[in-house]
Amino acid sequence: MRKLRTAIIGTGFMGKVHAEGIRRLGNVDLVAVASIDDQSAKQFADSVGIPASTGDYRTILNDPSIDAVHILTPNALHYPMVKAALLAGKNVLCEKPFTVTAAEAKELLDLAESKKLVHCLEHNLRYYPVVQQIRRMREAGDLGDILIVQGTYSQDWLLYDTDWNWRLDSKENGALRAMGDIGSHWMDMIQHLTGQKITALCADLQTFHKTRKKPAGSVETFTGKTLQPDQYTEVSIDTDDFGAVLLRMGDRTRGCFTVSQMSAGCKNRFSVE
């Protein structure tokens, strides 16, 4: 059986994570990477040992030898890039969110199914051993009827108004930030564990830092940066720092959870009860 040939589009924080994951599979070759320009693509390729690089992602899509692509770009680019990949006949694994609107997601779903291509998101938290154990226990009936669920997902990497990342900009990220970035993981997890779908919810979202200091240069995800006054611009923020949600699942189950990217001391604190 021949190995699948795959490529990465996007060289930010998740690029190295996906490169490592692909290499651990054993039956997939990571053959190319695309970034915003030739230099950054080449630098990333050299750092992780990928043989080919390009500053134009369409070069990868036009390569008939590549079976699948991982799209790891800012959220607003997911829709055009996934669509282009599907039209080029590539199977797609895309970072969440798939798109920033439901209409775009439905269009891509229909396109992928019409072309009989694999298209998916990866919710990596599903694969922790404890998560798989809880799911097996629920499926075996060991947990009884699940009537109440609750939990949190808290981080602190955007605690200060000097913390910056492209996700703060709704033009790149979409309207939902904390809720879309980490709340989506919590909602996927609770549905995965309980076997029930969320049927209704109401949410209170809050932006605590109405303005932030945007650096003149780029800042990689989860990295801090000390700025001098002449190195930043004060910009308005319209994405959420925090969210509290009440939800209904199935016929009887009820629950609540909170998400935050401004909880001091919480690096990646996830809980489900």
For the regions a language model picked out, list residue spans one by one.
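NAD(P)-dinucleotide binding in Rossmann-like oxidoreductases
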Residues: 5, 205-206, 226-273
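Predominantly a Rossmann-like dinucleotide-binding segment in NAD(P)-dependent oxidoreductases
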Residues: 125-234
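N-terminal Rossmann-like dinucleotide-binding module
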Residues: 1-48
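Conserved SAM-binding strand-loop segment of SAM-dependent methyltransferases
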Residues: 50-57
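Short active-site oxyanion
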Residues: 28-32, 67-69, 176
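Short, conserved SAM-binding/catalytic segment
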Residues: 43-50, 107, 111-112
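Beta-strand-loop-alpha-helix segment that lines the small-molecule cofactor/substrate pocket
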Residues: 68-75, 79-126, 141
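Glycine-centered tight turns that cap/initiate beta-strands
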Residues: 27, 49, 65, 142-145
